[in-house]
Design a protein with these regions (language model features):
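Short hydrophobic/aromatic patch on the recognition helix
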Residues: 55-65, 71
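Short helix-coil transition/hinge motifs at the ends and kinks of transmembrane helices
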Residues: 93-104, 165-171
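Alpha-helical structural segments
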Residues: 24-35, 39, 52-53, 70-94, ...
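Basic, helix-initiating cap at the start of DNA-binding domains
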Residues: 1-53, 70-73, 99
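Hydrophobic/aromatic-rich alpha-helical bundle segments in the mid-to-C-terminal region
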Residues: 126-130, 142, 146, 163-212
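Short helix-capping/turn signature of helix-turn-helix
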Residues: 65, 130-137
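A conserved beta-strand->loop->alpha-helix hinge within the catalytic CA
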Residues: 49, 102-107, 175-178
Length: 215
């Protein structure tokens, strides 16, 4: 909705402080937290520091989140939704009659690339994904991130089983599980290296060549 500008015979209305729309302040808090996680010493973020960055009181934060742990839960919700929604699209791209072995390998490639590219675009969230930002928080948060990577590994196993069977393996399920485990460890290692290097070593560095050795 637009408003008509005052004419010359009208006095301008007094300027009022713009109030955040419902949900907007909550989003601003999460964006500020994610931005702070990109900085050195991010594992020691306090609600006081977060409130100072936003120019509000700590009480204002608690009107939207009951605790800092709840803020991290909201970040994890975003990570899961962003990654799993796209991953589902990748897995659904196969043939209705079944995924050919070569297509399964391509899907696995795309899943790994998806996670690493997401981390590269969201460096602050990488510290949540690898657990650095969760060390002093409630253990349920780390458990959720563990489940996140477990789900990725399960999806990779699903992608790779047709290839293991087509290769004549006597134990295709086991072989697919081993391959999925290796890929998951690889992407976790890339994300950890990104965080430990001060966000300098990009997760997608030499990605195509690296995956060519594993797929």
């Amino acid at each position: 909705m637009t408003e008509q500008a005052p004419t010359s015979s009208q006095a301008p209305a007094p300027t009022e402080r713009k109030r955040a729309r419902p949900g907007e302040r909550r989003e601003q808090i999460l964006q500020a937290l994610a931005a702070m996680l990109e900085q050195p010493g991010a594992e020691r973020i306090t609600t006081a520091a977060l409130a100072s960055r936003l120019g509000v009181s700590e009480a204002a934060l608690y009107r939207h989140f009951a605790s800092k742990a709840q803020m991290f839960e909201a970040l994890i919700d975003f990570i899961e939704q962003a990654v799993f929604t796209r991953m589902a699209q990748i897995l659904e791209s196969g043939s209705p009659e079944g995924v050919p072995p070569e297509e399964g390998a391509r899907q696995a490639h795309r899943v790994v690339a998806l996670v690493l590219q997401f981390g590269e675009r969201n460096p602050g969230l990488v510290r949540v994904m690898v657990g650095d930002a969760l060390v002093l928080e409630h253990e349920r948060l780390q458990a959720r991130m563990n489940q996140f990577f477990d789900r990725i590994e399960s999806s990779l196993r699903q992608c790779l089983r047709p290839a293991a069977g087509a290769a004549g393996s006597a134990t295709p399920s086991v072989d697919a599980q081993v391959a999925a485990s290796v890929l998951t460890a690889f992407l976790q290692g890339r994300l950890q290296r990104f965080a430990r290097s001060g966000l300098r070593r990009l997760p997608t560095e030499h990605l195509e060549a690296s995956l060519a050795l594993m797929l």
